[in-house]
């Protein structure tokens, strides 16, 4: 086997021999190979004759392997490995031969290639001289001139010798394989019987596999979602708890208010019941015999009462004023009024308290009932009252000439009494501030006593005119 320098020299000689003919130019790889070989020759110093100190003065030589792998390019795309071996025969000694068909994705540059690793470097030159530029023909008769050059990658794949496996070709005798075949056949029968069941089983298996398959990133995302969900649940619970607390406070406030209102209502009802009991107790007390309860409220405190001698007497509020007969002397009523005033005041005050509440409930209803069912009787009574009022009024007018202004006031009171009798429902007259009583500002039974003023005055007129008990019964 020749050295690398000899091989390079032979290659250069061959190239020089072929150069003048103009058959083919050198490839770029060959030119690089020549340059590398020249640089190697220039760098190697000449060996010295003396052996002393030769090892220390020599530079370290780089080990370079000889190029032995060759590639044949631009072969026809339809060429096969067998056809290429037939055309390359006789092929020098080699330990590596690999053929690669054309790649259709590189159209229109569709070429096949082959790699050969020669054992003897001298055979490389002979092979190159023989097949570099050799024209290969395909099935269609197209010519493809080949190109022979050193392979860029000189290493070759080593074929490792493997021991033959003892179990090769014995799978049919394996008991596990036989068991698998049995279960597989049974599953095929079930599948043919019910495909929906198989589909459900496949989906379940797929879901199970997906559930089992996990990564740290998926675990982190899952934990993050669970944490966020937990925080949301806590916030929701806190908000619900606050709302329940507010609702509870509102309910307590409402319940407390209802309790207060209930207590107030009970208190007011209790007071009303006590007042009603007191009124009933007062009503149960009967007035003394011979006394006629009156509820007439005087319109003026200290109202002047007409007396027989032309004098005026102040009457206390709530006192009953009875008209004296105008036909008799005026001195006799004056004496009787002085003697019975004290007793009358006491009796009137006691009777007012007892009958004020009873009259308040029954007077208005009785008057409405009588006015509704007896309009003829009311009209006839009003005519009689007007006729009766003329006689006493004229007598009073005659006697009033002798008195000093007293008959004028009596006439006015008589006219008011007649108006009250004529009207179906008596109306309360408003009092001026100057006419209101100074001491007794509030009188509980004043309104109802004012409504009864008509009946009492009719009694007074009956007594003054001397008509007797008949007219008094009609007035009642």
From Swiss-Prot:
The modification Phosphoserine is found at residue 341. GO terms for molecular function: mRNA binding; telomeric DNA binding. Residues 421-434 are annotated as: Required for association with EIF4A3 and ECJ core components CASC3, MAGOH and RBM8A. GO terms for cellular component: cytoplasm; cytosol; exon-exon junction complex; intracellular membrane-bounded organelle; neuron projection; nucleolus; nucleoplasm; nucleus. Found in a post-splicing messenger ribonucleoprotein (mRNP) complex. Associates with the exon junction complex (EJC). Interacts with UPF2 and RBM8A. Interacts with DHX34; the interaction is RNA-independent. Belongs to the RENT3 family. This is Regulator of nonsense transcripts 3A. It comes from Homo sapiens (Human). The lineage of its organism: Eukaryota, Metazoa, Chordata, Craniata, Vertebrata.
